[in-house]
C-alpha cells in the first residue's frame, strides 16, 4: 500500500487528486489532505508516509520553502503545479516526478508505477525461490 499526503492550497485540487487516486487499480491510501502548508508541515514532521504530492505555488509558503524547512526528508516528493517553468528546480529538490495540472490520470499511474518499481525489492521470477532453497539447505 502506497501511503500519500496531498498538499495544495486549492481545495478542488486536493479533492480531485484524492478522487483520482481512489479510482486507480493501485493500492494507495491518502493519509491526509491539506490546503494550508503550515498545517501540513506539522503533520509531515510527525508522520511517516511514502509520497507527498506537493503544489509549488501557495500563499505564505511555497512547496520549495516547505521542503527547505525540513531537517530531513524521509519520503518522496511529486510536485504538482500549473506552471512548467518550475520543472528543473523541482528535480533539484530531489522530486521523483513533476505533474502538470490538471493532473492526467495516465501520467499519475505512470508516476506511481515508477515509484513502486524504484522501491520494490522484488527479484526476477525463480531467483527468490532459489535463494530461499539455498538458505534452507544450509
How would you name each of these model-derived features?
Residues 7-8, 34, 52:
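Conserved sequence signature across two-component system core domains
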